[in-house]
Amino acid sequence: MVSSQIESEEKSLRIIFMGTPDFASSNLRALLAGPDQVVAVVTQPDRPKGRGKKLTSPPVKVIAEEAGLPVLQPTKVRTDEFLEALAAYAPDLIVVTAYGRILPKPILDLAPLGCINVHGSLLPKYRGAAPIQWAVIQGDDEVGVTTMQMDEGMDTGDILLRKIIIPSPDETAGTLFDKLAELGTSALLETIEGLKKGTIRAEAQDHAQATEAPMLSKNDGLIDWSRTATELESLIRGMDPWPSAFCFLEGKRLRLFMPEVSYQKTDAQPGAVLRAGRDGLLIATGKNCLLVKEIQPEGKKRMTVEAFLCGAKIGAETVLKTT
């Protein structure tokens, strides 16, 4: 049960923070710099990473250990032992940002002010693990973050606060990630202040308007050249930097970056390279053309098309394929 206002506006809240990736890091840093007390941090277990599969700590854990905070990394969240461990910290509030697990009701009800979540979309749009990427892929003309009172569903809780920004014309998932991380921190601090003062009122989501943003896989980046140039531009930007959009050149994977729609008319088949020059690859699509300025050949680093052409030949008869 969420209290509309704590006993005193001046009280320093005891906060448990739950999060894992870089997107959550700025929120934790802001809480550590603020008037409230982060009493513990919960994050995902360390995972093997890189070619050497070295066990690597989540970004949030690194920050927590630098601050001397206790860190919990449960493999399961639906256990009495984990609930008791959280309860021992007597939290007033639990803050969750990209933790990566759905929390059970006993945890949601543990703190007097409940659990609040910072989500990287304008809910109810893009519920799920990859809201930022999907917003770019879909070509949204406004994006933002939402703080919500968590319930047992996947991003279905009541909305506390929304903040909106307009993406730039050349926005990628990577650049938008950075902007929304900063915006999310601002929204979180404003939400906590509003909960303290009792000035924020929760509003139910319109579930009929909900859309999903499932986790992306590498294969989601495969380019279908029969789609329009506008759709492909959004796809390539939404897949940058990961998992990246790709096609095949002479049987080898070619990742594409920095696209721009061109309205040059052509009767060439989709995927045909119309021009390869210093400004990029001009490629025919299902509607209009696409100018791609940077690429990453298989086994090599990302580079400009101009740099690629210094050591490779690609002409007007080249066709980029899906296999």
From Swiss-Prot:
Reaction equation(s) it catalyzes: L-methionyl-tRNA(fMet) + (6R)-10-formyltetrahydrofolate = N-formyl-L-methionyl-tRNA(fMet) + (6S)-5,6,7,8-tetrahydrofolate + H(+)
Main EC class the enzyme belongs to: transferase
Any one GO CC term of the record: cytosol
SUPFAM superfamilies for the chain: FMT C-terminal domain-like, Formyltransferase
EC numbers on record: 2.1.2.9
Name the UniProt record assigns to this protein: Methionyl-tRNA formyltransferase
Entry binding sites for (6S)-5,6,7,8-tetrahydrofolate: 121-124
CDD domains reported in the protein's UniProt record: FMT_core_Met-tRNA-FMT_N, Met_tRNA_FMT_C
Molecular function GO labels: methionyl-tRNA formyltransferase activity
Alphabetized InterPro entries for the sequence: Fmt, Formyl_trans_C, Formyl_trans_C_sf, Formyl_transf_N, Formyl_transf_N_sf, Formyl_transferase-like_C_sf, Met-tRNA-FMT_C, Met-tRNA-FMT_N
Function: Attaches a formyl group to the free amino group of methionyl-tRNA(fMet). The formyl group appears to play a dual role in the initiator identity of N-formylmethionyl-tRNA by promoting its recognition by IF2 and preventing the misappropriation of this tRNA by the elongation apparatus.
Family, per entry: Belongs to the Fmt family.
